[in-house]
Amino acid sequence: MVSSSVSSVTEVKVESYVFPPSVKPPSSTKSFLLGGAGVRGLEINGNFVKFTAIGVYLEESGVAVLSGKWKGKTAEELSDSVEFFTDIITGPFEKFTQVTLILPVTGQQYSPKVAENCAAQWKAAGIYTDADGIAIEKFLQVFQTESFTPGDSILFTHSPESLTISFGKNGAIPEVSNAVIENKKLSEAVIESIIGEKGVSPAAKKSLATRIAEILNHFDA
């Protein structure tokens, strides 16, 4: 049962930030379990500079969805499988990502990079539409006047057809979201940018594979 697998979920500490085993996203009545968490950083002049700590949560029903194909696989098998992460990204259940700032950033610094990556990916695949352009503009507008200090969080709820955006201050998760953008591709592209084949946080991907393998081993349909 899902409840037995949920009871095995533990918190994860990334740098000085703790991601609890379960959370209730803004404007949601559901609890999501912590799939995994890790740092996002870049090598700059020979030093690994850490920018954010990222936690990836799954709606509890996602455990049952993933179990059919992935239960019994090792953490290494999941970590090496592009298909496994794609099944999380595109699965018919909600995901919640918490991007907590280690270094300060403004909304105008953060959002264009995400938007440009999404648009470039869609255009390369030949699937970019006018509706996608409108969704990108809405995404940029949500961040326009925002500024984030260490400990603040950018929060995304990835529903099958929409992306909900929220902002948390000083480690808190707000009860109400800031915006909902009705665009399936954007919802998937944002989480894909984190845990997809070219995801920005290999540490979060490794944590996700390790923990989901363990959660599925405790899951009984």
UniProtKB/Swiss-Prot annotation:
Name the Gene Ontology molecular function terms of this record.
chalcone isomerase activity
**Which sequence ranges form a coiled-coil region, renumbered to this chain?**
none
The site annotation (Important for catalytic activity) covers 110
InterPro entries in alphabetical order: CFI, Chalcone_isomerase, Chalcone_isomerase_3-sand, Chalcone_isomerase_bundle_sf, Chalcone_isomerase_sf
Reactions that this protein is recorded to catalyse: a chalcone = a flavanone
* GO annotation (BP), single: flavonoid biosynthetic process
Q: What is its EC number?
A: 5.5.1.6
SUPFAM superfamilies in UniProt: Chalcone isomerase
Query: Does the UniProt entry include the keyword Magnesium?
Result: no
**UniProt keywords, alphabetically:** Flavonoid biosynthesis, Isomerase
User: What does the entry list as the binding residues for substrate?
Assistant: 52, 117, 193
Q: In which pathway does it act?
A: Secondary metabolite biosynthesis; flavonoid biosynthesis
Q: Keyword check for Amino-acid biosynthesis, yes or no.
A: no
The tissues where this chain's protein is expressed are given as: Flowers.
Pfam families from the UniProt entry? Chalcone
Q: What else is known?
A: Part of the biosynthetic pathway for all classes of flavonoids, a large class of secondary plant metabolites, many of which are brightly colored.
Write out the function statement from the record.
Catalyzes the intramolecular cyclization of bicyclic chalcones into tricyclic (S)-flavanones. Responsible for the isomerization of 4,2',4',6'-tetrahydroxychalcone (also termed chalcone) into naringenin.
The family line of this record is: Belongs to the chalcone isomerase family.
Q: What is this protein called?
A: Chalcone--flavanone isomerase
